[in-house]
């Protein structure tokens, strides 16, 4: 399971011209589910992301977590994170989880974040989405489990 996380001032996702999810200060998560991933990995990533101290304190030192600042999380499924670009010019998605498994684990991740009391918005699984964000920093991390 892979996640690209970005600290944002705001972020939103639009499907078919309609805003389906938006947040203010918080973290945008692009989540890719691969074959062999399970609930334990999704739960670990959820806890890791909301606990990472990537927000500035009074001294502007990265010392506060999403929970500490009362921020929100926008979760967007992105199977292309499972893409392998090592050979040729077209990515291979052989390592991506099948859609039904990807949806199940994406939903598990979202529920794990919500269970921790974090306000969470989402995109729509398998939809063609337009994601907008105002990156804060920029601060971006890649997490893999």
From Swiss-Prot:
Its domain of life reads: Bacteria
User: The motif Gly-cisPro motif, important for rejection of L-amino acids: which residues?
Assistant: 137-138
Keyword Plastid applies: no
Q: What is its EC number?
A: 3.1.1.96
What is a biological process (GO) this protein takes part in? Answer: D-amino acid catabolic process
Under catalytic activity, the entry for this protein gives: glycyl-tRNA(Ala) + H2O = tRNA(Ala) + glycine + H(+); a D-aminoacyl-tRNA + H2O = a tRNA + a D-alpha-amino acid + H(+)
State the disulfide connectivity.
none
Gene3D superfamilies hit by this protein: D-tyrosyl-tRNA(Tyr) deacylase
Protein keywords: Cytoplasm, Hydrolase, RNA-binding, tRNA-binding
Where it sits in the cell: the answer is: Cytoplasm
What's any one GO cellular component for it?
Answer: cytoplasm
**tRNA-binding keyword on record:** yes
- UniProt-recorded Gene Ontology molecular function terms: D-tyrosyl-tRNA(Tyr) deacylase activity; Gly-tRNA(Ala) deacylase activity; Ser(Gly)-tRNA(Ala) hydrolase activity; tRNA binding
Q: Which family does it belong to?
A: Belongs to the DTD family.
Entry remark concerning the domains of this protein: A Gly-cisPro motif from one monomer fits into the active site of the other monomer to allow specific chiral rejection of L-amino acids.
Concerning NCBIfam families, the annotation shows: D-aminoacyl-tRNA deacylase
User: Subunit notes for this chain?
Assistant: Homodimer.
Protein function: An aminoacyl-tRNA editing enzyme that deacylates mischarged D-aminoacyl-tRNAs. Also deacylates mischarged glycyl-tRNA(Ala), protecting cells against glycine mischarging by AlaRS. Acts via tRNA-based rather than protein-based catalysis; rejects L-amino acids rather than detecting D-amino acids in the active site. By recycling D-aminoacyl-tRNA to D-amino acids and free tRNA molecules, this enzyme counteracts the toxicity associated with the formation of D-aminoacyl-tRNA entities in vivo and helps enforce protein L-homochirality.
The name under which this protein is listed is: D-aminoacyl-tRNA deacylase
């Amino acid at each position: 399971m892979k996640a690209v996380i970005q600290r944002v001032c705001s972020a939103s996702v639009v499907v078919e011209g309609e805003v389906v999810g938006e947040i203010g200060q918080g973290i945008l998560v692009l989540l890719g589910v691969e074959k062999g991933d399970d609930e334990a990995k999704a739960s670990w990533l959820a806890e890791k992301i909301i606990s990472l101290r990537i927000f500035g304190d009074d001294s502007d030192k990265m010392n506060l977590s999403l929970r500490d600042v009362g921020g929100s999380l926008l979760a967007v499924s992105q199977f292309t994170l499972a893409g392998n670009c090592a050979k040729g010019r077209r990515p291979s998605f052989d390592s991506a989880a099948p859609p039904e498994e990807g949806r199940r684990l994406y939903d598990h991740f979202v529920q794990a974040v919500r269970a921790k009391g974090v306000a969470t918005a989402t995109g729509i699984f398998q939809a063609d989405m337009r994601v907008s964000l105002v990156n804060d920093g920029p601060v971006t991390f890649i997490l893999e489990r």
